[in-house]
Amino acid sequence: MGSPAAGWGAAPAKRARREGSAESSCGSPADRDPRLWDTERLCQHLSRNGVGEPGLLRRFRESGVTGAMLLDLPACALRITHACLPDERLKVLACLNQLRQTADIMKVFNDPVHGHIEIHPLLVRIIDTPQFQRLRYIKQLGGTYFVFPGASHNRFEHSLGVGYLAGCLVRELKERQPELDITQRDILCVEIAGLCHDLGHGPFSHMFDGRFIPLARQGLNWKHETASVEMFEHLITSNKLEEIMESYGLILEEDIAFIKEQIGGPIDETACEESWPYRGRPKEKSFLYEIVANKKNGIDVDKWDYFARDCHHLGIQNNFDYRRLIKFTRVCEAGNQKHICARDKEVGNLYDMFHTRNCLHRRAYQHKVGNIIEIMITEAFQKADCFFQIEGSKGKLYHISTAMEDMEAYTKLTDNIYLEILHSSRPELSEAREILHKIERRELYKFLGETQPEKVNEIPKDEYDGLAGDIANSKPEKDPPDVELTAEDFIVDVVNMDYGMKDQNPIDNVLFYCKADPSKAIKISKEQVSRLLPGTFSEQVIRVYCKRQDPIIVSAAKQYFVQWCIKRDFTKPQDGDVVAPHLTPLKQSWNNRSKTEYTTASEPSCKQKLSFNK
């Protein structure tokens, strides 16, 4: 899975600077590799792992043991035997042996986004399982790959990146604030949660849980995070990893609960009403739950990796610097809990983060062509669903829409099902196969246009299903086209875009600290940052497509769409004046601009005549 970590003979590097350091976000090589530690650094490690009695540490210093000596544990043990008291030796040797195991077989992966990253051997054991390797066959961005040819990356490499960044952040906090009592167990559990947080994704990632399951299993409240927790349990038990986890110092019941809670939230939903709903870690370590999946404000290492990775593969500029933010984070207490806070001067960087998220959704994730391809794949999967059988545990058979009920069956469900349908010769799959052939030939459903409702007119989710029929009933009365269309001819895709917290400003939920008093958590209002920041943080875009290919029918469908926009008091489609010039004058609000607003720039006084108001 990678090459062994750097050689034992490397010279010790300078200790990483703290806040504002230009070093790697995970510290210098000397910080990361115990084999490069001096005696004092080993003493710090012993102290942070419960072996910190002053007399013991004094005697350990006298032994002169360094990290390089961990390779020869018998010789190391001999020095400790001479220096330490009998009841101290076992505790010291157990702690150092665990450290030696970690240092001995750390693996290095060459990641295109983060560079050379070190992965703990327990994480490597998790990676080398069928359940994790499955992520190699699930596209990170689903149907977006059909539009952006560089977006061929998968959930596998994203998961490696999240596990790595989770370790970077928690180690930085441990180094900066020893009083937090972050242990090696905590670090390992956070890394595992980051690594395994996406185990439950289905074919084409969010297309499966966002489009297919809501249609195939209507009324089922299912999330991929739920499947991630179940798949993690299945991974551990089916590969018999309990013993190896214990050998690295994990306490199974407590730590597995902690890992699952980081991925999917509190295990017991009824416990959410309690003051502290989590079981894996006490309230004193509440900040650990904000690293992998931050439910409070959405700032977490999952986003940091997919921003960087998706931008890299899409060819889109990433303006958010997660490395800098890691250097300016610390834990402060607020509301009787400890939270991860950012330095006050980083508020602009965080707005850049959410702006990057919005740009990615606009330009890539919600691309009109990528979305209609996912809709067509979803249709194909629906038509193939009842004819596909996937064997699960005890020989029981499942369909595409039910495979997530059994993790053995779900392990076999990947993007490959697209090719199985495409290349099948089974007559019962002919309808599904034909839809996929249309995608391959680029015979996509025709885009008619998009419109935006005002905030007060936004369409609620329970009305989505009736929109196609509403458009079909909107045949223009003035010069109507000689074509009758039905609801089956239209596809309506309602896209809700925001900064991650619907219509709220996510920065309102972020805590900061200032240089003058780094222990105090504060909030920063939008007005304190800039007057150029957005006034609203969400909007709804309605896109309409026609399933028919005939140009005459498509032209008529566009007129239906324009008439529907007039009826619903939505914004004018961008090409509304072209596709329905006889309809757009009927809408007063679409034609309230004076002629002077269209004066060309070559005419006199154009600067005074131009208006930029909507």
From Swiss-Prot:
**What PROSITE patterns is this protein classified in?**
HD
Recorded hits in CDD domains, A to Z, give:
HDc, SAM_HD
One of the record's GO molecular function terms: deoxynucleoside triphosphate hydrolase activity
Gene3D superfamilies to which the protein is assigned, alphabetical: 3.30.70.2760, Hypothetical protein af1432
SMART domains documented for this protein: HDc
Q: Which residues bind dGTP 1?
A: Q140, L141, R155, K303, Y306, D310, R357, Y365, Q366
User: Which GO cellular component terms, listed alphabetically, does the Swiss-Prot or TrEMBL entry include?
Assistant: nucleus; site of double-strand break
SUPFAM superfamilies the record matches = HD-domain/PDEase-like, SAM/Pointed domain
Please name the catalytic residues of this protein: H224
The cofactor remark states: Binds 1 zinc ion per subunit.
Residues involved in Mn(2+) binding? H158, H197, D198, D302
**Residues covered by the HD domain:** 155-307
Please list where the region (Disordered) is annotated: 1-33
Reaction(s) this enzyme catalyzes, per UniProt: a 2'-deoxyribonucleoside 5'-triphosphate + H2O = a 2'-deoxyribonucleoside + triphosphate + H(+); dATP + H2O = 2'-deoxyadenosine + triphosphate + H(+); dCTP + H2O = 2'-deoxycytidine + triphosphate + H(+); dGTP + H2O = 2'-deoxyguanosine + triphosphate + H(+)
Q: Which residues bind dCTP?
A: Q140, R155, H201, H206, K303, Y306, D310, R357, Q366
Enzyme class label:
hydrolase
Low complexity: bias regions: 1-13
Q: Which residues bind dATP?
A: Q140, R155, H201, H206, K303, Y306, D310, R357, Q366
Enzyme Commission no: 3.1.5.-
SAM domain location: 37-102
- Annotated residues for binding of dTTP: Q140, R155, H201, H206, K303, Y306, D310, Q366
| Assembly behavior | Homodimer; in absence of GTP and dNTP. Homotetramer; in GTP- and dNTP-bound form. Interacts with rbbp8/CtIP.
Q: Which family does it belong to?
A: Belongs to the SAMHD1 family.
Return the protein name: Deoxynucleoside triphosphate triphosphohydrolase SAMHD1
For this protein's source organism, the top of the classification is:
Eukaryota, Metazoa, Chordata, Craniata, Vertebrata
The gene behind this protein is: SAMHD1
